[in-house]
A protein has these predicted regions:
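A short helix->loop->beta-strand "cap" motif at the edges of active sites that frequently abuts
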Residues: 68-70, 150-154
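Short internal beta-strands
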Residues: 70-78, 158
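C-terminal and late-domain segments of enzyme folds
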Residues: 26-31, 39, 47-49, 55-57, ...
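Glycine-rich, charge-decorated loop segments at or immediately adjacent to ligand/cofactor-binding or catalytic sites
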Residues: 83-87, 156-178
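Glycine-rich oxoanion-binding loops at beta->alpha junctions
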Residues: 87-120, 132
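Conserved functional hotspot residues or short segments at active or partner-binding sites
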Residues: 275-344
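Glycine/threonine-rich flexible loop motifs
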Residues: 129-141
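Conserved small/polar residues in nucleotide/adenosyl-binding loops
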Residues: 1-5
Length: 344
């Protein structure tokens, strides 16, 4: 991963950012300068609500407007085409008439079949990722690439920023003995690549079966050292429980609480920022955590009640119970290490 970061696919400027920078995502570069990639193509689009252009128009609408382009099918990842579903929820789009055929790749079907790709000669992948290994959108990417290789379909990845920067790495590399859909590649927890760079690495390192014909539409104006809010791009929460960039920064480490008996804050308006349980002493916990002097972060004692929130968490841990714990407050995101903090 570090070698790929140094490959200068995107530059690492390391200069002070005085104002927000204009960045064009892959979808905008495609539509403005690379239309020859999709002309006369029959397309399968892998996307969700985050697949928008610079004017917030969904990519599927833009593609349907292009002459001599036929959008045959849309594949949606976890959380659905419109980001309407909480983690793990299965989705059915059979009743939507105004769109091309929409097929969920989460649930019983996670790889496009030969029937699903019938008459398709190009797969476009365009989803905003978060930069954490256990975000399942990147697992969907690999499985789509496997199907593309098996059925001889080209893959075009429209690149988007890594919102938590492209020059930082945190956490251990996954041991493939524990490979699941939630951890699919031997990469660090926070891997510091864009989705396009990761696609190239997946192919180059042979982490999937086959070797699909792969091409990346690079962004324009993005550099590795940029946080998402240092661009002029609007924030669209990539999944229901990542409402803002600060949550995305905290997520790689604090998501590990999901596997414990501690609430990770689902069922509140601050998932992953709040954590606790009914039996915790919030004062003592916050004191102990602050005494660790972890860089770039402080902990505030809090009380909260996880409750069902439609589209975010229907059945949160400790539902309707009073929980005591801490709120994590990042004071210096350049020094903050989410994974180290989560493990502490």
């Amino acid at each position: 991963v570090y070698k790929r970061q140094q490959s200068l696919y995107y530059k690492n400027e390391l200069k002070p950012i005085k104002e927000k920078l204009t960045v064009l995502n892959g979808i905008d570069v495609l539509l403005e300068k690379k239309l020859h990639f999709i002309k006369s193509r029959k397309i399968a689009l892998v996307t969700n609500h985050s697949g928008i252009d610079k004017n917030l128009i969904p990519n599927y609408k833009r593609l349907m407007e292009v002459e001599d382009v036929e959008l045959k099918v849309i594949f949606s990842p976890e959380h659905g085409l419109f980001g309407e579903s909480e983690a793990g929820e299965k989705i059915n789009y059979s009743d939507i008439d105004e769109l091309p055929r929409v097929i969920s790749l989460y649930g019983g079907t996670r790889k496009p079949s030969a029937e699903m790709l019938k008459d398709v000669n190009l797969i476009i992948y365009d989803i905003q990722d978060i930069g954490a290994r256990f975000y399942t959108y990147i697992s969907t990417l690999g499985m789509v690439m496997e199907s593309a290789s098996e059925y001889g379909v080209k893959v075009l990845v429209l690149d988007r920023p890594n919102p938590i920067k492209g020059n930082m790495i945190e956490g251990p590399i996954l041991d493939l003995k524990f490979q699941t859909f939630v951890g699919y590649y031997p990469i660090p927890t926070r891997y510091g690549l864009t989705i396009g760079e990761l696609a190239l690495m997946i192919n180059g390192e042979k982490w999937i079966d086959g070797n699909p014909d792969l091409e990346i539409v690079k962004m324009k104006g993005w550099t590795r050292d940029l946080w998402y809010d240092q661009t002029k791009l609007p924030w669209v929460k990539p999944s229901p429980n990542i409402p803002d960039l600060n949550t995305a920064i905290i997520y790689p480490g604090m998501c590990m609480l999901e596997a414990t008996n501690i609430s990770e804050g689902r069922g509140t308006k601050k998932p992953f920022k709040k954590f606790g349980a009914p039996w915790i002493n919030k004062i003592e916990l916050s004191k102990e955590l602050n005494n660790l002097n972890l860089p770039g972060v402080v902990f505030k004692p809090i009380t909260f009640i996880p409750t069902p929130i439609k589209g975010m968490s229907n059945n949160p841990k400790y539902k309707n119970q009073v929980c005591h714990g801490s709120e994590i407050i990042v004071t210096n995101r350049e020094k903050f290490n989410s994974v180290r903090t989560g493990m502490k």
